[in-house]
Amino acid sequence: MTIEEKGKISPRKKIKGLEERYKEARQHIAVAILKESPPAEDVDISEAYQQSRSLLGDYVTLDWQHRQDILRIINQIKRYADDDTRRRPLNIIMQAEPGSGKSHMVNCLARKLEPHHAAAVNFNMASLQSIDDLSQPLDAVRNLKVVDRLPLLFLDEFDSNPANFATLLPLMWDGELQISHRDLMLGKLVIILAGSGKNIEQVMKSAKAMQTPPEAQETKLVDLLSRINGGELEIPALDTVAGDRDRRIDKVCLTIALLQSRFAGKLETIPWALLRFVVMSKFRYGVRSIAHLVDLVSPLQENAKAMQLSDLNLPLLSVPVLRDSSLAYHVFSEDGPAAIIELWTECCKSEIAVRIRKQGEEEEYF
C-alpha cells in the first residue's frame, strides 16, 4: 500500500465526520436556545447555523435523517440527468404538511442541481379547475427544454382532488398529456408530487405490503403511486421530538434564514427572546406562519447589523392586541391566547443577544 493510499480518508469516515459535525451543531443550538433558563451571557451560534445551510443553502436543516433523505433524492436526480437512455419522467412523491416550505425546498433543490441544468416550475393543483389550467406550467416546462434545461415540475397538493389522478397518469408514464387539441410531448423531466393527505401514507403502506387498497376509490391513487420511480421524501413536522431527533432546532435555523432573507443577510446579532419564542410556540401553518411572524418585525435602519429586542414591535403586548392582529391566525396554544402572551413576556425578560453571523462575513441569500 502506498503512502497516498494510506492517507486517504474513506467515504464512510467522511460521512461519520460530517454526521458528528451536525450533531455538535444541534447540541450547540439546543444548549443556547432550548434550555429552560436563558444563557448567562451572549451566545454565538453562527457556525452551527452555517452548518444547517451546507446542503441546500436557504433550505436549512440540521436534522441528519432529513438531510440524508434529501441527499438520496439529489443523487437520484443526478443519475437520471446523466443517463441519456432514460427518457420517461423521473417521478418523486413528497409528503408534508401545508405551509411546510415545499415549493421553497424545490427551488433550493433546483439551485443545488444547476450543474445538471435543473430549473423549477411550480404549480398548485388545488387551483386546477380544468385540464386546460395545466397548459401554463407545461408550456413553461417545454420552454426550459428548448434551452436544454432539466425541468423540475413541482405539483403541490396533487391529492386535493382525487379526480385529477387519472389526468396525471399519462404525464407520469411517458411525459405526454393531451390538452384540448394540443398533444404536449415533454419527455425527460422530473415530476415532484406533493401531498398532505393521510390516505397517501395508508395506500403506500398497503401497496408495499402487496395488500388491497383500504378503499375501492383509492385504486387510481395506487395506479398513480405505481409510477413513482424516483423515491419518496417526507418533510417532518417542525415540532417533531423523538429520541435524538428534535426538529425545533430547525425552527431556530429557519427563523434566522427568514430574517437574513428579509434584511439582505446583513444581520449579525438578534434577540435570544425571539428565537426562544419561536421554538416554544405552536404555529398553525409551519414555515408559512413563522415567515409571517418575521414579516411583522419592524423595519430596521439601513445597514443595521444588530437587531435589538426593542426593534421587534410584535403584536404580543396583550391578548386584545394579539386577537386584533394577523398573527392570531398563525400562532396558537391549547391553553388559549393568554398563554402565548405569557410566553412572550417570559422570553423578553432576557436581553441576551445571539450571534448568527461572524463580523464581516459575506453570504448569498435568496
Short names for language-model regions:
Residues M1-K16, G101, L225, L275, ...:
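N-terminal accessory segments that target, anchor, or regulate ATP-driven/P-loop NTPase machines
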Residues M1-D84, S196, L293-G336:
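Extended, charged/polar low-complexity intrinsically disordered regions
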Residues P98-S100, S127-S130, D159-N161, I191, ...:
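Conserved nucleotide-binding/hydrolysis micro-motifs of P-loop NTPases
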Residues H117-D148:
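Short glycine-rich substrate-engagement loop in P-loop NTPases that contacts/grips substrate
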Residues R111-A120, E176:
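Post-Walker A helix-loop "phosphate-sensing" segment adjacent to the P-loop in P-loop NTPases
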Residues M1-E19, I228-L309:
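Conserved AAA+ ATPase small/helical "lid" subdomain
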Residues V147-D174, D183-I192, G197-A207, L221-R227:
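Conserved AAA+/SF3 P-loop NTPase catalytic/coupling segment centered on the Walker-B
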Residues T85-M105:
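Walker A/P-loop nucleotide-binding motif
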